[in-house]
């Protein structure tokens, strides 16, 4: 009886310590939701990188969506976050992250911070993340949220991501999270030799192809991955494409 009581108390203390380590606003309910998301939406669809799966288990996605949509945070769908932007569905976040083949030593540039969720996931599998958001309200909100959650290896700034972040270049990997009909030349120039770039490429107002671009010297190679639907990249990208 004494041993059983000791074991019971130990389990309670362990659970309390585990909950205490969770970010503010997280709970066992959301931990279970993330585990279900990983098992049912990611692993079954061939996401295999263990570090990516761990990141998806750990980052509290529900804190990055509007309060009215928290109940949908772990569903297999994109969600609106305001300013005409969305947070990508979990599978796409995991797929794009996995395509970069990060090992933990890389410096990554993200174009389109949005809610900050993708940057948070990247921060778990890369050394440093630099993220740019053109929508000032989203930029400010995401920056404050990422800081409050303790993501110290993320640098965020407001601006037009089309031109990249030349001061911090080159980057081992670049991710564009909005649709564009061409790969911005400044981003190709800021990609390190041997680096990888992933983006939704095609008509910004229709369906696109998720593509992977690799660089070897001045040789850039492109692989088509799958069909996707992203919101348009705004700013100079639309001007350059002739859209208004």
UniProtKB/Swiss-Prot annotation:
CDD domains (UniProt xref): AdoMet_MTases (cd02440)
GO molecular function term, any single one: protein-L-isoaspartate (D-aspartate) O-methyltransferase activity
InterPro entries membership: PCMT (IPR000682), SAM-dependent_MTases_sf (IPR029063)
Catalytic activity, as annotated: [protein]-L-isoaspartate + S-adenosyl-L-methionine = [protein]-L-isoaspartate alpha-methyl ester + S-adenosyl-L-homocysteine
Active-site residues from the entry: 88
Enzyme class: transferase
Cited PANTHER family: PROTEIN-L-ISOASPARTATE O-METHYLTRANSFERASE, PROTEIN-L-ISOASPARTATE(D-ASPARTATE) O-METHYLTRANSFERASE
Protein name stated in the entry: Protein-L-isoaspartate O-methyltransferase 2
């Amino acid at each position: 009886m004494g041993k059983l009581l000791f074991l019971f108390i130990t389990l309670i203390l362990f659970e309390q310590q585990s909950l205490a380590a969770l970010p503010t606003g997280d709970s066992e309910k959301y931990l279970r939701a993330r585990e279900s998301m990983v098992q049912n939406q990611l692993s079954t669809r061939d996401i295999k990188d263990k570090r990516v799966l761990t990141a998806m288990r750990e980052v509290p996605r529900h804190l990055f969506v509007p309060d009215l949509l928290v109940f949908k945070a772990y569903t297999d769908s994109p969600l609106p976050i305001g300013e005409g932007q969305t947070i990508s569905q979990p599978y796409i976040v995991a797929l794009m992250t996995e395509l970069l083949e990060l090992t933990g030593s890389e410096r990554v540039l993200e174009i389109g911070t949005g809610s900050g969720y993708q940057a948070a996931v990247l921060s778990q599998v890369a050394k440093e993340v630099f993220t740019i958001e053109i929508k000032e309200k989203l930029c400010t909100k995401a920056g404050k949220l990422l800081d409050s959650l303790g993501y110290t290896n993320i640098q965020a700034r407001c601006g037009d991501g089309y031109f990249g972040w030349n001061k911090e270049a080159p980057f081992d990997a670049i991710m564009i999270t909005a649709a564009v009909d061409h790969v911005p030349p400044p981003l190709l120039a800021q990609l390190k030799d041997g680096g990888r770039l992933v983006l939704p490429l095609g008509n910004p107002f229709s369906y696109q192809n998720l593509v992977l671009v690799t660089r070897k010297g001045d040789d850039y190679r492109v692989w088509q991955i799958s069909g996707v639907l992203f919101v348009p990249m705004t700013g100079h990208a639309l001007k350059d494409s002739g859209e208004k």
